[in-house]
Structures are given as C-alpha cells and as structure tokens.
C-alpha cells in the first residue's frame, strides 16, 4: 500500500498545523524519534508527524521525505519503492533469455511477453531499440523493421 507524504511548514502565521485535531505546532511529536518537532519544515505520513531526517525506510535507511520518493507502508514497515518490490513484488522470467526478472528491475513488455532491458533487441542484428523504433514480434523473437523480410524468410526455411 502506497502512502502520501505531505510536506508542512512551521510558521507562526500557520497555527494550528492540523485543522482537524487543532494541534498547535509546539505540541507536535515526531513519529520516529518521539522528540518535539521544532523544525520549520516537517512531514506528515501514516497519520503522524516526522522530522525530515526521521522518516526513513526500515530496511535500507534511505530518506523517504525527499521530493519524488514514495512511502510504502505494509505490515507495520515503512519502505522505499525498491525494498517494497523486493519484499512483496512478483518476479518473472525474461522471454528472451529465460533468466529471472526481479520485481524491481526495469523491463520492456510486448503483449504477454516481458524482457530485461538488455534483452530487448533485434534477434537478427542484435541492435537495441530506441523509443519509436518499429519491430515485429515473431513467437518470442523481436525483429527490427530492417530485418523482418530476412527473418521471416529464414523462419520459413526451418
């Protein structure tokens, strides 16, 4: 389950910080270190307030409050995306090399086939594809536009 992280600012003009609970900024307690939050900037996640340095992944320790990071909270653990996928994601097999694809790896998907990025290349000339390149999927083989005729002819001979 992914959770939103809200960045808050502690400014005397912004009292109270939490409109629902009517908590004044001086009474905020960090969900990590249990100390009072006196910093100007702090975070709100999992229904708690946090110092920016205290909200971190329970496994690798990376900071979860950084811009662009997502917090995953499952079974009482705060996790970064990589660790969440490592623990709860599903692995698969590459349609080209038949080796394991870990849940956190970047992949290319064509119909029901999944490929490692390094395996997503023309079966004939071994050229890696770029965005916008045209190709044809023949069985589990990916063939670039330039090699389609030769590859089809070769396949018919076998």
From Swiss-Prot:
All residue ranges annotated as the LIM zinc-binding domain in the record: 28-90, 92-154
Subcellular location field: Nucleus
CDD domains, per database record: LIM1_LMO2 (cd09384)
Coiled-coil annotated residue ranges, if any: none
Alphabetically ordered keywords of this record: Developmental protein, LIM domain, Metal-binding, Nucleus, Repeat, Zinc
GO molecular function, one term: DNA-binding transcription factor binding
Tissue: Expression becomes restricted to the ventral blood island (VBI) as the embryo develops. In late neurula and early tailbud embryos, also expressed in the dorsal lateral plate (DLP), the site of definitive hematopoiesis in the tadpole. Expression in the DLP diminishes during tailbud stages. Expressed in circulating blood cells of tadpoles. Also expressed in non-hematopoietic sites, including the tailbud region and the central nervous system of early neurula embryos.
Keyword Nucleotide-binding belongs to the record: no
Induction behaviour: By bmp-signaling. Inhibition by fgf regulates the timing of hematopoiesis.
Broad class of where this protein is predominantly found: nucleus
Name of this protein: Rhombotin-2
Function in brief: Transcription factor that acts synergistically with tal1/scl and gata1 to specify embryonic dorsal mesoderm to a hematopoietic fate. Induces globin gene expression together with fgf.
Keyword set includes Transit peptide: no
Cellular-component GO terms for this entry: nucleus; protein-containing complex
BP-aspect Gene Ontology terms: erythrocyte differentiation; positive regulation of transcription by RNA polymerase II
């Amino acid at each position: 389950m992914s959770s939103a992280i809200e960045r808050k600012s502690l400014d005397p003009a912004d009292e109270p910080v939490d409109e629902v609970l009517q908590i004044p900024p001086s009474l905020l307690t960090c969900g990590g270190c249990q100390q009072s939050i006196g910093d100007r900037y702090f975070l709100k996640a999992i229904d708690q307030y946090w110092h920016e340095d205290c909200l971190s992944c329970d496994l690798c320790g990376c900071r979860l409050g950084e811009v662009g990071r997502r917090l995953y909270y499952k079974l009482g653990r705060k996790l970064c995306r990589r660790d969440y996928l490592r623990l709860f994601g599903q692995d698969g097999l590459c349609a080209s090399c038949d080796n394991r694809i870990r849940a956190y790896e970047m992949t290319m998907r064509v119909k029901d086939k999944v490929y490692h990025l390094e395996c997503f290349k023309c079966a004939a000339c071994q050229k890696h594809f770029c965005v916008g390149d045209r190709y044809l999927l023949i069985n589990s083989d990916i063939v670039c536009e330039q090699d389609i005729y030769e590859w089809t002819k070769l396949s018919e001979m076998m």
